[in-house]
Amino acid sequence: MSLPDSLPSSSSSPPVTREETGFHRFEHHGNDSGFDHRDRPPWNRSEYDYRHGSVVASENVRNNSTSEDPWSCVVVVATFCIFVSMTLILGLYGTTNVWLGPNSSFLIKPTSVFVQNVIVEELGNKGSGLILYGLNQAPQLDVLTKWSEVHYLAVPNDSYKYWIQYLNKGSRVKVSYNVESVGSSLYLVIAQGVDGLSEWVQDPTRPDTTLSWHIISDSGYIEQDITKSSSYYVAVGNVYLNEVKATIDIQVEGVLYDTTNAYYNCSFPNDKCTLSVPLFGTNAAVLTSPGPKLNNSKNEFCAKLSYEPRWIAYIVCMGVVTALLLIVSSLFNKRQPVTEDETVDENDDVAPLIPGKDDDNSSWCSSYSSILTSTEELEGAHGEGHSSTRYLCAICYDAPRDCFFLSCGHCVACFQCGTRIAETSGFCPVCRKKIRKVKKIFNV
């Protein structure tokens, strides 16, 4: 049966379109390269122990004074706030393209604290009939409407064709079909969103990739209830070798938003509409499209939706969060208990090893020997020929060991090397205890 050359038209009959172009080829899978492009897990960097004066980088951070903690907190909080702000601006409130079908009603609900203006730009056919409404509160979804489209098709082999419909929750779609090619069949699907359509195009024979999937022949109809507001694609596909002729009648019972109380409406006189969002006010916008038009096989409408951020809100939020964390950090540092090691007098840079017995060389030597005994853990036992090196600095092997660490008391380095260890690592190389102070030993 051939396609009719002319189609009857009347005011009561739905728009009828003869489809001769606009078909797409299916994407055959199996040509992937086989590479897995997922990110590799991050490398784990092992920590190095202290060896002969080398310092672990992570230990340098531990030695920072408590006076630097608030500034570190400021840097961390500022970085976190900037990351969250960029995520909101580029992600949740980033620029997106909205595809609508006939009689669409798309709700836009910006957050008034972070959004100052809603900008909608018409793409594609200029003057297509899109209208942007502004309301003081979210409108009711209670306006019922019906429309239908009839399409005559001659689907080539290994091709498909689709029609977009933006449907709100509570709508209903009925698709009637009549396959005129005897002994032939087509795939008829209803896919949710671009992702659902793309999955079906990659493998048309899989029934679990779309909301509705049928193999049609002869005549009949399918129905589908809509439970989520989104864009939906009604598509037919031919994976066989011969061309298939068919008639597709799409009937929609839609639910639209009520825009009778709108205080703002814009019909895109300059291909762009800007809706100002009041601060701390309930606001909503609705983008609508006209009904189906005759001799328009697609009835598609495209608009670019973007948001102008309210920068002052981001700055104030960052300041408040930073101030709160600084206060919490300050209170936490003040309430930390003072340990016994921190009570050591650190203002006395030079002090005798044994108070009251500075003139007693034998007592000083006895105490000095007892300190040096503990260094065998680091140096190990040496022969008599190496006894002279046991009293040299274990770091530079040049100067004598003339200092010890508080609070552990180990003596393994000269005063210069010991000071450098305290300033860089901050931990005793023998027992790994934190160095509170480096005391110099004077031979009197």
From Swiss-Prot:
Q: In which tissues is it expressed?
A: Expressed in the shoot apical meristems (SAM), root tips, pollen and inflorescences.
What this chain does, per the record? Exhibits E2-dependent E3 ligase activity. Involved in pollen mitosis II (PMII) regulation during male gametogenesis.
Describe, as the record does, how this protein assembles with itself and its partners: Interacts with At1g78040, At1g10650, VHA-c4/AVAP4, VHA-c''2/VMA16 and TUFA.
Entry keywords, A to Z:
Membrane, Metal-binding, Transferase, Transmembrane, Transmembrane helix, Ubl conjugation pathway, Zinc, Zinc-finger
Question: What EC identifiers does the entry list?
Answer: 2.3.2.27
Which PROSITE patterns does the entry mention?
ZF_RING_2 (PS50089)
For bias type Low complexity, the affected ranges are 1-15
Q: GO:BP terms for this protein?
A: mitotic cell cycle; pollen development; protein ubiquitination
Of the GO CC terms on this record, one is: endosome
Give TM segment ranges: 74-94, 312-332
Q: In which pathway does it act?
A: Protein modification; protein ubiquitination
Q: Where in the cell is it found?
A: Endomembrane system
Q: How does it sit in the membrane?
A: Multi-pass membrane protein
Q: Enumerate the PANTHER family for this protein.
A: E3 UBIQUITIN-PROTEIN LIGASE APD2, OS05G0521000 PROTEIN
InterPro entries assigned: APD1-4_M, APD1-4_N, Znf_RING, Znf_RING/FYVE/PHD
Per its UniProt entry, what is the enzyme's top EC class, as one word?
Answer: transferase
Q: Which GO terms describe its molecular function?
A: ubiquitin-protein transferase activity; zinc ion binding
- Compositional bias, Basic and acidic residues, is annotated for 17-41
Q: Where are the zinc fingers (RING-type)?
A: 393-432
Q: Does the keyword ATP-binding apply?
A: no
Name used for this protein in its record: E3 ubiquitin-protein ligase APD2
What is the documented disruption phenotype for this protein? Answer: No obvious defects during the vegetative developmental stage. The double mutant lacking both APD1 and APD2 exhibits an increased percentage of bicellular-like pollen at the mature pollen stage. Plants lacking APD1, APD2, APD3 and APD4 are defective for cell division in male gametogenesis resulting in severe abnormal bicellular-like pollen phenotypes.
